[in-house]
Amino acid sequence: MNVLSCSINTLIKEGLYEISGVEVGQHFYWQIGGFQVHAQVLITSWVVIAILLGSAVIAIRNPQTIPTDGQNFFEFVLEFIRDVSQTQIGEEYGPWVPFIGTLFLFIFVSNWSGALLPWKIIQLPQGELAAPTNDINTTVALALLTSVAYFYAGLSKKGLGYFSKYIQPTPILLPINILEDFTKPLSLSFRLFGNILADELVVVVLVSLVPLVVPIPVMFLGLFTSGIQALIFATLAAAYIGESMEGHH
């Protein structure tokens, strides 16, 4: 019994030691001129972009009148993105399909890459590679891009009259309406970042404590959650664009 107890205590201590070694926020930088560039995000983002560009080349290469399985898949993805855009934006959704589609596909592939690609085997001088959306810099950039898009959508349709929405239905709500536009990118970025980071940390902790087979259901749940987060981000982005063009809250 003493031997068994000692073995269990040793395993627990080793597991807790490994968990304590899990680091968040360690970064690897490139020095370019007088600037420090966050290399981890760039490397993983380039990989995701390469996957998307490669898929696009495959999708448009040699299209068939009778679609093949691969062509059917890409057409299904395109129709899905169109449906999301049309539902949220309305009749003028057409010009925004590429933007919403790019957001959705980049976030979706980025999220899944954290679970499916073996980033950890690539050794860096400092830090480690992870999904691009595992970094707050990426999610904030995507959220700010969305903010620019819905401001552009409103201004391009209504001109300076777009800003009249801030005093509707009453000028008393001006501070609240302004604050709402600041909270939109914050909620988009932190929701995506928090969910992806938490998912990866949960898997790391479980793998440290229990055999590899046990965390597999959690990993599948993480894949499902990652897809949902991409859909939520793209849907909200389309909704904000539609809202700015319609001029109501």
From Swiss-Prot:
Any one cellular-component term (Gene Ontology): proton-transporting ATP synthase complex
Top-rank lineage group of the source organism: Eukaryota
GO MF, one annotated term: proton-transporting ATP synthase activity, rotational mechanism
Topology within the bilayer: Multi-pass membrane protein
Keywords, sorted A to Z: ATP synthesis, CF(0), Chloroplast, Hydrogen ion transport, Ion transport, Membrane, Plastid, Thylakoid, Transmembrane, Transmembrane helix, Transport
Matches recorded under InterPro entries: ATP_syn_F0_a_bact/chloroplast, ATP_synth_F0_asu, ATP_synth_F0_asu_AS, F0_ATP_A_sf
Chief location of this protein within or outside the cell: plastid
Keyword Lipoprotein set for record: no
Chloroplast found in the keyword field: yes
TM spans (from-to): 40-60, 97-117, 136-156, 201-221, 222-242
Localization: Plastid, Chloroplast thylakoid membrane
Quaternary context: F-type ATPases have 2 components, CF(1) - the catalytic core - and CF(0) - the membrane proton channel. CF(1) has five subunits: alpha(3), beta(3), gamma(1), delta(1), epsilon(1). CF(0) has four main subunits: a, b, b' and c.
Known function: Key component of the proton channel; it plays a direct role in the translocation of protons across the membrane.
Record-stated family: Belongs to the ATPase A chain family.
Name of the protein in its database record: ATP synthase subunit a, chloroplastic
Species whose genome carries this gene: Barbarea verna
Underlying gene: atpI
